[in-house]
Amino acid sequence: MSKKTIYFLCTGNSCRSQMAEGWAKKHLGDEWNVYSAGIEAHGLNPNAVKAMREAGIDISEQTSDIIDPDILHNADLVITLCGDAADKCPMTPPHVKREHWGFDDPAKAEGTEEEKWAFFQRVRDEIGERIKRFAETGE
């Protein structure tokens, strides 16, 4: 059986979609080809790498990419992770299922360094739980 393709999209392919790609490779990698991209490519956020490493997942080799029309049009499932991506994502063909799983942007966290770091950890855990639920239930 060939693998299905899941494509995670957010604004800059820097934090949320990168963490989603890492979690999905862990929980869905046997059944899905996992990709992520952004409306723009802002580069991999070092705190996203650090947060995922803390959870035992290495995303340091992932790249920050803009949306690839070939992957977008051939994906089985496209998931937007922020309102900006949901609004600006290019049209997907009717056969491509599209869902929106909204998460706060950890790159916009304010406060002390500890508060910003806690924000990254929270969003990391929320994305991980959502992907784990999808892996277990298909929803």
Curated annotation (Swiss-Prot):
The active site is at 10 (nucleophile), 82 (nucleophile), 89 (nucleophile). It comes from Bacillus licheniformis (strain ATCC 14580 / DSM 13 / JCM 2505 / CCUG 7422 / NBRC 12200 / NCIMB 9375 / NCTC 10341 / NRRL NRS-1264 / Gibson 46). Keywords: Arsenical resistance, Cytoplasm, Disulfide bond, Oxidoreductase, Redox-active center. It catalyses: arsenate + [thioredoxin]-dithiol + H(+) = arsenite + [thioredoxin]-disulfide + H2O. The gene is arsC. It holds the Pfam family LMWPc. Disulfide bonds join 10-82, 82-89. Belongs to the low molecular weight phosphotyrosine protein phosphatase family. Thioredoxin-coupled ArsC subfamily. Its EC number is 1.20.4.4. This is Arsenate reductase.
